[in-house]
Every structure is written in structure tokens, then in C-alpha cells.
């Protein structure tokens, strides 16, 4: 089982990153994709991935919250990062109209620019969409035939949004959000509609600690070592064997991100 979304650059992991990675290995997690959300964090994620070349890859991109800082220099730096062997996808990029830390116009500019970089580099995109589905799809769709893959990270949308995303060919990332008996029930009901070859699983650690995890860590911090819990729960709700599902999502992640195969 491969965790496609780990924010290992978070300050919450500053004191024990090595132990976090070791616990993930011990738990049976077969690889980690470290998320970049700004130029600085993308650089840090790449450097961290280089410390674990057989286990970690990273992404390089600018999150919509940080899109107000996008400029030509940002684009050049993301381009440069995309050339490093540790960087397996462009992102986390997309639209977030929930809080609008950057204006919609700034978000759209940064998103479109990153789609262009991914297309030029023939790299997958690691996508974020919140309360922006229609505009997100309008901007993304013209690029899809130019991209090797598109991964919708931390999907929490509606059934119609899921159907749109699947028709467009997107991979669907599911987090421990689905383990929340309050806000995750609607998503839980959608799980059987995701084809086996389109499903990816992720912790989004240190965020989104599964609410049904027992015992919970005293820190209330999520870690990639809890991915097996998400695998077991998702397998049960999809009516599948957990061991099989773990292998399946690992195969999907390796097919999309091709860790260890950059330049081949």
C-alpha cells in the first residue's frame, strides 16, 4: 500500500521525521509521496525524498491558498524542480473557493500555469479542488489529453462530481475523511462507484487523523503508518479483501507516479 499524500514538510514532523518514515515502513506502507504546496515546501519535499530514494518521491507545485505569489520566477523554479528525479508530479495545484486565501483569478492563473508545466514535462498532476468543481473542470479538461495522468487528491465531493471526475479520466484519492462518521458518510456511500483501477489512498498526514482509529495517538497527529487502517476500512465499505486492496492501490500509485523510473 502506497501513501500518495504525506505532508512530511510540516512543522508537526520536525522533531521525528526519521521515526515517522520508519513507523510507516514497519506498518507495511510501501512508499510515500511527499506533497509540495509552495516553492519552498516543494524544495524541502524533494530534499526529504532524496534521503529515502527507495521509498519516497515528491511533488512540486503551488497550492491555491498560495497562488497570490505566483509569477514568472515561481514558474521557472517549479520547472527546475520538475527536472529532479525525486519529483514525480506537478502540484498540489488547483482551485479552492472555500476560503479564497488567494483570489479566484490568482488561483486560476497559477493552476493553468502549472497544468502547462505538467504538459510540457509530460508529468502527472496532483490536484486540489474544493467548492470549485465546475470552474476546476473547465480549466483542467483542455489539458487532459496532454497529461499522462491526473490525480484528484483528497476527494470529498458529491456523486455528480465523482461521476464528472471519472468520466474525465481522473484518479481518485481517498483519505481518512471517509472514516468520519459525521462528515464522511456521503463519501463512504460513493466508494463502490470508484473503479478498482482509479482508486488511490492517502493519509494527508499530519492532517485528517481517522476519527474511528483506536487507540488514537496522544498527539492527535496523523501519520502514514495509519494508512493500513484506511485500507481496511475502505476495503470493508467496498466489499473487498483488505490485503488485495492494499496491493491494488500500490499498483495504481506506481503506474501513475512511476517511482524510481524518471527518465526511463
UniProtKB/Swiss-Prot annotation:
Keyword check for Magnesium: yes
Catalytic activity, EC: 3.1.11.-, 3.1.13.-
Function: 3'-5' exonuclease that prefers single-stranded DNA and RNA. May play a role in the H(2)O(2)-induced DNA damage repair.
UniProt entry keywords in alphabetical sequence: Cytoplasm, Exonuclease, Hydrolase, Magnesium, Metal-binding, Nuclease
PROSITE patterns: TATD_3
Domain of life, per lineage: Bacteria
Similarity-based family: Belongs to the metallo-dependent hydrolases superfamily. TatD-type hydrolase family. TatD subfamily.
Principal subcellular localisation of the protein: cytoplasm
Gene name of the record: tatD
Residues where a divalent metal cation binds: 92, 128, 153
Quaternary structure and partners: Monomer.
Stated name of the protein: 3'-5' ssDNA/RNA exonuclease TatD
GO molecular function: 3'-5'-RNA exonuclease activity; magnesium ion binding; single-stranded DNA 3'-5' DNA exonuclease activity
One GO CC term on file: cytoplasm
Cofactor: Mg(2+)
Entries under Gene3D superfamilies matching the protein: Metal-dependent hydrolases
Subcellular location: Cytoplasm
